[in-house]
């Protein structure tokens, strides 16, 4: 890998995103707006004294889910534009290595993912008073890893789409099952054996489990670090798969 080439690619992609106001809004503003909607859904709930708010549980999980979904969408569509416009094919004819190109894209989108997670977490804590035992810094860490996972999956799936509509069609296959089975709606121990088994290998499940550990403990636990490490390993694995499809032409 050539660090200079990687950074040059990242700077180019960030420059393109800077002029794409809709994508910037989708990344930075929309998750905060959706989190606002979640907060007001539970604003008037009647709870016994000392009983935790539903928002403290659901809103925390949304800090993992929203960045994941948004970064998957933005990355897959942006990467598809690079392919269909011929930009990617032209770059691959230059001396730049595939790994430099791929990680350049990943670095650029990951920077946006980190900004997105910081904005959403700040809104949750300092506007809506998210109340959990763990540190906000750990929440941001898991949110960022999850957003980068969305980036990696977006890079991979973009290779198998010919239009932006087809890129969006990957959501019901890649994103929605993870949201349904991650333990947000039904505790994993209450699922049947088949669904519980599937849930156990889905990346989003590990992020939800990590956030549960943060919510219930004042200090980082071994289980939380283990879940974070698994997520990091999945991100690396998906990026390797994405690099194998980088030269695939979209016609």
What are these regions (language model features)?
Residues 134, 150-151, 166-169, 182, ...:
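Extended hydrophobic-aromatic, low-complexity segments
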């Amino acid at each position: 890998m050539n660090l200079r080439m990687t950074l040059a690619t990242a700077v180019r992609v960030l420059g393109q995103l800077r002029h794409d106001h809709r994508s910037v809004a989708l990344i930075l503003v929309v998750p905060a707006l959706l989190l606002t909607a979640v907060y007001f859904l539970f604003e008037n709930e009647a709870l016994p004294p000392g009983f935790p708010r539903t928002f403290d549980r659901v809103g925390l999980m949304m800090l993992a889910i929203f960045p994941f979904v948004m970064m998957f969408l933005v990355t897959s569509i942006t990467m598809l534009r690079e392919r269909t416009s011929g930009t990617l094919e032209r770059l691959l004819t230059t001396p730049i290595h595939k790994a430099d190109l791929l990680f350049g894209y990943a670095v650029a989108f990951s920077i946006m993912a980190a900004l997105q997670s910081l904005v959403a977490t700040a809104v949750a804590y300092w506007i809506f008073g998210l109340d959990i035992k763990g540190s906000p810094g750990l929440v941001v860490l898991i949110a960022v890893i999850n957003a980068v996972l969305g980036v990696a999956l977006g890079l991979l799936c973009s290779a198998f789409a010919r239009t932006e509509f087809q890129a969006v069609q990957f959501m019901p296959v890649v994103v929605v099952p993870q949201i349904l089975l991650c333990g947000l709606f039904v505790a994993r121990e209450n699922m049947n054996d088949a669904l519980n088994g599937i849930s156990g290998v889905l990346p989003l499940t590990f992020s939800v489990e990590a956030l549960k550990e943060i919510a219930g403990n004042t200090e980082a636990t071994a289980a939380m670090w283990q879940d974070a490490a698994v997520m990091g390993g999945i991100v690396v694995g998906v990026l390797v798969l994405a690099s194998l499809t980088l030269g695939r032409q979209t016609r």
